[in-house]
């Protein structure tokens, strides 16, 4: 797993040069409080997000909770909730690090094959991830630290207020899209 700083150093080391991507590192540092706010917003609402996503998935496919369905009996429902929570947790890790490698290496590697072997319907799982993606975007947009603290407390390049979370929403969405691609 490489964060933005490690990636820049490894890249510079491989080319035997100095770290030249200072602008990208400066942007990463400047987004630090917003990034922490975004991760906190997702982590603080994780239980509700997971249960709502699984409930939404079940509402769209009632067969999942019927006898023989993948969310029946209770132990299968618990496994479904656990898996959704794990996916969400690794998305937050990736968002915090600014890098998808932790998500790829520790969560997505072999996930589709495992679900296929267990007979888990990936279309329903993809739908639950899509619901969590929409929820995460809503929670991230609702937690602007700059709006509460004021520009005088943020000296590292505060963005325009309307656009303060757009890049983090896009980044988080890209991580959810990676999960969806891995399952499809």
UniProtKB/Swiss-Prot annotation:
The UniProt annotation places (2R,3E)-phycoerythrobilin 1 binding at: 48, 59
Q: Name one GO cellular component term.
A: phycobilisome
What is this protein's expression induced by?
Transcribed during growth in green light.
Q: Where in the cell is it found?
A: Cellular thylakoid membrane
Q: Where does (2R,3E)-phycoerythrobilin 3 bind?
A: 165
Q: This protein's superkingdom?
A: Bacteria
Q: Name one GO biological process term.
A: photosynthesis
Modification after translation, per record: Contains three covalently linked bilin chromophores.
Family per record: Belongs to the phycobiliprotein family.
Stated name of the protein: C-phycoerythrin beta chain
Organism classification, top ranks? Bacteria, Bacillati, Cyanobacteriota, Cyanophyceae, Nostocales
The gene from which this protein is expressed is: cpeB
């Amino acid at each position: 797993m490489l964060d933005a700083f490690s990636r820049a150093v490894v890249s510079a080391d491989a080319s035997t040069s100095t770290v030249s991507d200072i602008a990208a590192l400066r942007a990463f540092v400047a987004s630090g409080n917003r990034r922490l706010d975004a991760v906190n917003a997702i982590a603080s609402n994780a239980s509700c997000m997971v249960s709502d996503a699984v409930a939404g998935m079940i509402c769209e496919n009632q067969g999942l909770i019927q006898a023989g369905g993948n969310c029946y009996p209770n132990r299968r429902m618990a496994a479904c909730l656990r898996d959704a929570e794990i996916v969400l947790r690794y998305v937050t890790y990736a968002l915090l690090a600014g890098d998808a490698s932790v998500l790829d290496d520790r969560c997505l590697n072999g996930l589709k094959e495992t679900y296929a072997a267990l007979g888990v319907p990936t279309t329903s799982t993809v739908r639950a991830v899509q619901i969590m993606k929409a929820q995460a975007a809503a929670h991230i947009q609702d937690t602007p630290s700059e709006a509460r603290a004021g520009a005088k407390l943020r000296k590292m390049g505060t963005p325009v207020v309307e656009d303060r979370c757009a890049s983090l929403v896009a980044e988080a969405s890209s991580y959810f899209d990676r999960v969806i691609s891995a399952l499809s």
